[in-house]
Structures are given as C-alpha cells and as structure tokens.
C-alpha cells in the first residue's frame, strides 16, 4: 500500500509518500509545495496544481491529512483552513480515501508522546525510514502523518479480522 501524508500549509504544504508492506515502511519521496505571497486564490490554485502533480507522479493508494489548529489570529486560521481544503480535495478528486489525524495523535503514534517537538518528530521519522533525506520540517511532518495513517490502517485491519473470527 502506498500512502501519501500531507501537512497542510498556505506557504509550505509538506507531503511525504511511503510504501507499506506488512509492518515494513519504506520511504518513497517527500517534498514541499510552495506558494508565494499574493492573491489567495492564485496561491490555492498553485498548491492544487503542485499537489495534483505529486499524486500523478507517485500514484498513492490512500492519503492522510493532519488537522489544523485554531490560533488567536482568525484570518490566518481561515487561510490555513482553505489550504487544508486543497489538501483534502486533491486526493479525494483522485478517488482516494483520506484519513484525518490530530497533530497530537500523529506525534503520539510516531514519537510516543503527544506534545513532541519538531526535532523529535524529525528524529523519529528518520528512525522509521532509515536513510531518508528530509526536504524540511513540513515534509517530516507529512511523513509522520503517513506513518500514523499506516499504523491506523494496520490496526483497523487487525481489529476487523479479530471481530470476524469472533463472530464465527
């Protein structure tokens, strides 16, 4: 299974692709979609195009997006929410199921604690994906989202199998 993880952002939208085979995770690629300052509609269009290119190039089977947090600046929060909409829309347009995870859930899955620092996330992503060259903190976060989704899908599959066995 190939998983695309997305860390939404208006200026820098991180993405990471991993392959999952059983409990084995393998890094495929990671990067950052950038948008320049200026007209919001053009920035969103740019992010849409870049993320669409990532999907076309790497052909993921599923995707996952990190929830955004609300901060004191309402305008910034709304703009971030619009970028997150692009992060949800592009994989959905490609027919993919899209998982959504809170930042604390991602950190808890990858690092072991829900309030981990960026450096801890990057360190643990490197441990999960040996040899990975991270394009930046946003790409590391996106890979962490992909790892979280892979673990969640595996756990859900094991639970469904156990319930099916118990029902027999």
From Swiss-Prot:
GO MF annotation terms: crossover junction DNA endonuclease activity; DNA binding; magnesium ion binding
One GO cellular component term: Holliday junction resolvase complex
Active-site residues, Swiss-Prot/TrEMBL: 7, 66, 138
Cellular compartment(s): Cytoplasm
GO biological process: DNA recombination; DNA repair
CDD domains, sorted: RuvC (cd16962)
Note on how the cofactor is bound: Binds 2 Mg(2+) ion per subunit.
EC number of this enzyme: 3.1.21.10
Cofactor(s) required, per the database record: Mg(2+)
Pfam family, one: RuvC
Record's function text: The RuvA-RuvB-RuvC complex processes Holliday junction (HJ) DNA during genetic recombination and DNA repair. Endonuclease that resolves HJ intermediates. Cleaves cruciform DNA by making single-stranded nicks across the HJ at symmetrical positions within the homologous arms, yielding a 5'-phosphate and a 3'-hydroxyl group; requires a central core of homology in the junction. The consensus cleavage sequence is 5'-(A/T)TT(C/G)-3'. Cleavage occurs on the 3'-side of the TT dinucleotide at the point of strand exchange.
Name of the protein in question: Crossover junction endodeoxyribonuclease RuvC
Species of origin: Cereibacter sphaeroides (strain ATCC 17029 / ATH 2.4.9)
């Amino acid at each position: 299974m190939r998983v695309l993880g997305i860390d939404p952002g208006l200026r820098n939208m991180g993405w990471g692709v991993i392959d999952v085979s059983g409990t084995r995770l393998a890094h495929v690629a990671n990067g950052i979609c950038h948008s320049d300052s200026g007209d919001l509609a053009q920035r969103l269009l740019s992010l849409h195009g870049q993320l669409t290119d990532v999907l076309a190039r790497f052909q993921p089977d599923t995707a996952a997006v990190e929830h955004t947090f609300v901060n004191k600046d309402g305008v910034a929060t709304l703009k971030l929410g619009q970028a997150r909409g692009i992060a949800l829309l592009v994989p959905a347009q490609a027919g993919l199921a899209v998982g959504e995870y809170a930042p604390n859930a991602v950190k808890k899955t990858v690092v072991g604690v829900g309030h981990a620092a960026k450096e801890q996330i990057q360190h643990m992503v490197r441990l999960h994906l040996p040899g990975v060259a991270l394009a930046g903190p946003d790409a590391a976060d996106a890979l962490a989202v992909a790892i979280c989704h892979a673990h969640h899908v595996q756990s859900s599959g094991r639970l469904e199998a156990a319930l099916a066995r118990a029902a027999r």
